[in-house]
């Protein structure tokens, strides 16, 4: 079965053209970390994800999420490269050269987001532009989601979509995972999403502020210690539990299902140790 286009229109965040695409209906998801979950991608509909990333146009789908990194000119990037240790300097200079060869004027640096936009988001964008997906209403799509596991925002923030797009899917899914940074700029929308969504917190102080609204949070912490091969979070609060997937490789999101906001009445919020390509930049958030 073809992937489904659930929304194709202006971003609620800034009015730019975006599209929401439900994937995984025909083939099992290969993401070992999440398990076989249906995935909802939210991307710019008018430009390649890499272009959006390096120009800041991804704000249409990610809002003010600090994980996006920052946009600088190539000249500024060269100045920054000159101040870095040898390995990091070489890596940034290589990226600057690639950007220049592509005709870019700007580049994204210090990105903490784990999503590699040149992979799945780009594949999905190209297929969308080739007309390989069909349109469906959220209510129609809910028929295929019912009883299955759903990962909303495999890329992009569901706060970029009008109310009523993801809600019907979340209501019938057996397991839901979703995260939003919209509490940084639109708390009213964040509270709506909190019924099945974790509010992304960038530090413990922020998480505690969100808890007062009744929401659950997902927080990434740079304060961790490696114990017996496991990154154990040091600043975990009494109202938090460490993400099980970060403790045991045998656990996947589909097995766990804790990141579903208030959907099942789970009390504790979730914290995970920083990891991946952007971990080095997370401590500065």
Task: Indicate residue ranges for each PLM-predicted region.
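Class I S-adenosyl-L-methionine
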Residues: 1-285
